[in-house]
Amino acid sequence: MSSRDFSIPHFIGQAIDTLTHIDSKFYQSIKYLIFKPGFLSAEFVKGKQIAYMKPVQLFLLINIIYFFSASVLDQKTFTTPLYFHLVGATPYRTLAQSMVSQKIQERGVSIEEYEAHFDKNGTAFSKTLIFIMIPVFALLLQLFYIRAKRFYVEHLVFSIHFFAFLLVLLIIGLPLFKFAIMGTAALFHYREAIYTEYWSIGFISICLFFYLSLSLKTFYQQSVILSAGKSLLLTYSLIWVLWFYRLILFFSCFYTT
């Protein structure tokens, strides 16, 4: 290496070139992730990876953006506060109520004090536990496409891109949808509370169904009808994957609070 390689201008130039290269890859990857469902996964397994960010890199970056925006927009899709564990429509609600009640009595603290610590841990854990859903969903894909004779890693790549899109939907799509609903209500002077979480669930489910249908068709090369049928079942299965995630999150927070 020459002395020029250690100069400040050369160092800054390399840094700018690297950032520009990453920015270009991110832009291309996001564009295809949103507007060409299944394309990035198909390209990756074909070995065409140079022009796009690798699946894990893309997901990590979007994950960071999501949790930053979630704190600003007050989204709790993955953080799941204690209140939801105890009174939400969760399969483990009764167990959670019993465990929390016993711990509060043993510690001699109020529910408000315990809830504050629990939710703080939940925010921290959710940033890493979200990764649990990716391999679980990949296992479902392997079952649905067992005759395709694909490697598990191929399903995993598809799953990573799918959950990356889900985060993008939560970052951009859901806030815009909420704004549209509330804006329409204000336009017609509808003063009662019109927006509920059921609107969010419905919106996300419909978006994921259509996105997944197109992704499956592109990646697994099956008919539109077959892909749509499997998408419907997988979208429903996602509810149980989310319950599994929230159960793991609850136990992680409970035993560390």
Residue ranges and their predicted role:
Residues M1-T257:
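Membrane-proximal intrinsically disordered regions of secretory-pathway and membrane-system proteins
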